[in-house]
């Protein structure tokens, strides 16, 4: 695999920081009882008031802690498994590594932009930056010209394309409906405590 020199230190750094960030999100001490407030747009929201995500809403905190759990139980083991195999030349591991880095990039880009400011903000930014450049290096190491010859003729290309297209269509319908509803009904957008739709922007722009 190309760019091994950089990836050999970048990926362990990502794993260490992601393990710390995810564990902190799940086990950070302190907090009180959730409380209600009204946002600047007149929307009633419930603030979590516990742990690392104390300043986020109950709904947002639950979603972020679910991401933390996925990171600890799935993403980090996959990085640990795929990295040495990819370095030894396994194409499957290389593609798995790229996909897992994409997950880390998406997760910590959204955390850096959407999570209420907390003690780990700099960690989120570091993970966003490291995973972005690691993903770029990982993708640059793929022999794109020789890639078709590495796949079986029996690969279900249409099924894969349908799955990807269906996922994109589902997200588009779901998020565009949420975006246009306030225009049509004259109601406040469902932003909770935020000022804009960060996840919707990422999903519609990237996914």
Walk through the language-model features, giving the residues of each:
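Membrane-interface helix-loop-helix junctions at boundaries between adjacent transmembrane segments
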Residues: 83-137
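N-terminal membrane topogenic signal
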Residues: 1-11
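Alpha-helical transmembrane segments of multi-pass integral membrane proteins
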Residues: 10-21, 102-106, 126-143, 154-181, ...
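Alpha-helical transmembrane segments of multi-pass membrane proteins
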Residues: 16-33
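A loop-to-helix transmembrane entry motif
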Residues: 35, 60-68, 188-207
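Membrane-helix boundary elements
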Residues: 41-58, 170-200
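Membrane-interface helix-boundary motifs at transmembrane edges
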Residues: 85-91, 146-157
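Interfacial helix-start motif at the membrane-water boundary
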Residues: 49-74
């Amino acid at each position: 695999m190309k760019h091994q020199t950089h990836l050999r230190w970048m990926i362990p750094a990502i794993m260490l920081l992601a393990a710390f960030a995810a564990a902190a999100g799940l086990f950070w001490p302190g907090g009180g009882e959730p409380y209600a407030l009204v946002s600047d747009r007149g929307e009633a929201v419930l603030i979590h008031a516990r742990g690392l995500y104390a300043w986020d809403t109950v709904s947002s905190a639950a979603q972020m802690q679910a991401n933390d759990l996925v990171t600890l139980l799935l993403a980090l083991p996959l990085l640990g498994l795929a990295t040495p195999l990819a370095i030894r030349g396994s194409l499957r591991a290389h593609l798995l590594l790229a996909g897992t880095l994409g997950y880390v990039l998406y997760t910590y880009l959204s955390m850096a932009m959407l999570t209420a400011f907390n003690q780990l903000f700099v960690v989120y930014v570091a993970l966003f930056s490291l995973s972005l450049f690691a993903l770029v290096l990982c993708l640059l190491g793929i022999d794109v010209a020789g890639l078709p010859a590495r796949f079986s003729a029996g690969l279900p290309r249409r099924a894969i394309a349908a799955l990807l297209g269906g996922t994109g269509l589902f997200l588009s319908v779901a998020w565009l409906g949420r975006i246009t509803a306030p225009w049509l009904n004259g109601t406040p957008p469902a932003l909770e405590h935020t000022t804009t739709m960060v996840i919707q922007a990422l999903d519609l722009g990237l996914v």
